Amino acid sequence: MKAADARAMSADQLKDELGNLKKEQFNLRFQKATGQLEKSSRINEVRKDIARVKTIARQKAAEAKA
């Protein structure tokens, strides 16, 4: 996910996306533990996407207060 895509989302959509990313991260960790993970770089991509979504959600919340 690109930052521009996340910025275009509403706060509710960001929450939904964050939930989806956390579920995906859990599944990837589970696959890694069981030796079924084929694309290990996806773990880092998802981790960075989670950080990106959290950052943008926080920025939007700060803008709403100001």
From Swiss-Prot:
<dbReference type="GO" id="GO:0003735">
    <property type="term" value="F:structural constituent of ribosome"/>
</dbReference>
<dbReference type="InterPro" id="IPR036049">
    <property type="entry name" value="Ribosomal_uL29_sf"/>
</dbReference>
<dbReference type="InterPro" id="IPR050063">
    <property type="entry name" value="Ribosomal_protein_uL29"/>
</dbReference>
<protein>
    <recommendedName>
        <fullName>Large ribosomal subunit protein uL29</fullName>
    </recommendedName>
</protein>
<keyword id="KW-0689">Ribosomal protein</keyword>
<dbReference type="InterPro" id="IPR001854">
    <property type="entry name" value="Ribosomal_uL29"/>
</dbReference>
<dbReference type="InterPro" id="IPR018254">
    <property type="entry name" value="Ribosomal_uL29_CS"/>
</dbReference>
<dbReference type="GO" id="GO:0006412">
    <property type="term" value="P:translation"/>
</dbReference>
<dbReference type="Pfam" id="PF00831">
    <property type="entry name" value="Ribosomal_L29"/>
</dbReference>
<comment type="similarity">
    <text>Belongs to the universal ribosomal protein uL29 family.</text>
</comment>
<dbReference type="GO" id="GO:0022625">
    <property type="term" value="C:cytosolic large ribosomal subunit"/>
</dbReference>
<keyword id="KW-0687">Ribonucleoprotein</keyword>
